[in-house]
């Protein structure tokens, strides 16, 4: 994307930036803050995975192809800020005594399968679910086998299970999100 290339320093600012005074500086500030938030979450055990996404291609209104839609810095920026906004919303609602609808991902019930997958790669994970240990394994595999990392990520995502939504009464702490290493996610 044009924003991603600009953030990476490989392209000039988009012409649209000139229409809003201060927009470039604001996006740079958001990018810096998002990187700090991501680092903080990762230190707490947020999982850093890379699954393959597809982008539909239409010609004359007809779907003609699916193209890989790789991650980029702009997409990561948006995702990081969405996570922060959801966490802030959850904390605000709790602080003000309001109920909320929370998205949570409990610790994997099939942790033994994730342990076995790691063992297949020569890594021993703790006997109990540990997001930080899992993320360290994933990061090592990203470096050791970049070409196979998307497949490994997909396997782990499937073993983690799907997130769920839960109504959380006022004053009750959220159940937490294993993959994001946080309790506040509304």
Regions found by a protein language model. Name each.
Residues 1-186:
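Conserved, carboxylate-rich catalytic/transport cores that coordinate ions
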